[in-house]
């Protein structure tokens, strides 16, 4: 198992290129199951979750060819089975995204429940209700979702009680081959969903209301779609993370290959804290702040402040003057990084879903443990400003969603080494 060793308080300067968005790539990879013709997907990030989804597609019978490290050609013309097994699904919760396309195209599928998933307690029930609204029969048998619609799916209204990004994506993909019109009410509005809509539209699916909370889909009454090649949008969370690298180290950094309006909640907050930003068409440059002020954040669905940036801003709060407050409204157990930041010297108190951070605090290098993907990046941010050497363990979480993070940070002047645990 690998860990990162980070020398703190090293000056940073330069630019970084943002990779394709993992959270856009995953549903688009799943959507290729709807296509009867070959599709080329460009700007795929080389991260563990993408490799896991590619392996799942291959296991279902899709033929895959990597044309270069970030371009994949996929043909799902002759899939030979429709069972997504536990061995593959347990590696990644987003594997549930194959449910909608498999059911829509083949009228029956078996998809393992994602690991540790209790029906009712986790959002998987939103996916199942959406499929049932389109006429599917759903049974849970021996840890598998058995879904079937012998006469095909039929368009209907799908109302999400709670906004769900992957739930919206699964419903969109299923509706694309359903007979008639489907309305998704209380749909998620993330840019990743907008790109999935564009991909489905390239195959002839009519979708109204793209980017809004109500989507109207007229299904294509064929056995499959003819999807076109696509380039994955830049990763707004990776971009936000590198903006935080600049912010926490108070460095001048340029973040390239981005879509600035996808980052507005993040850039607005950085300006409020005291940073100057030069926002161009596809880049943002962050300049050192004379004074970094404490702030308040409440996580919300897009276009609100993203829950996936909450951990990074908690690390940043340790270097801001005054008391910062972060309220997490979307997920439980999303403050697991707080106790690890405390090991570095952060002054953080927790009360249910609210974290209070007192700053500015001098952090000291230590051994810390990543608990999830975004927590791992928060610990790296804190280690960059800590006095001495820090070691971040369990970075397999990091590798799920950040492409070559240590290479990109080292190119800015940092001293980060990937080493093997003894």
UniProtKB/Swiss-Prot annotation:
NCBIfam families: murA, PRK09369.1. One of its GO terms (molecular function) is UDP-N-acetylglucosamine 1-carboxyvinyltransferase activity. GO terms for biological process: cell division; cell wall organization; peptidoglycan biosynthetic process; regulation of cell shape; UDP-N-acetylgalactosamine biosynthetic process. The modification 2-(S-cysteinyl)pyruvic acid O-phosphothioketal is found at residue 117. UDP-N-acetyl-alpha-D-glucosamine binds at residues 93, 122-126, 308, 330. The keyword ATP-binding does not apply. It catalyses: phosphoenolpyruvate + UDP-N-acetyl-alpha-D-glucosamine = UDP-N-acetyl-3-O-(1-carboxyvinyl)-alpha-D-glucosamine + phosphate. It comes from Helicobacter pylori (strain Shi470). Gene3D superfamilies: Enolpyruvate transferase domain. Signal peptide: none annotated. Belongs to the EPSP synthase family. MurA subfamily. This is UDP-N-acetylglucosamine 1-carboxyvinyltransferase.
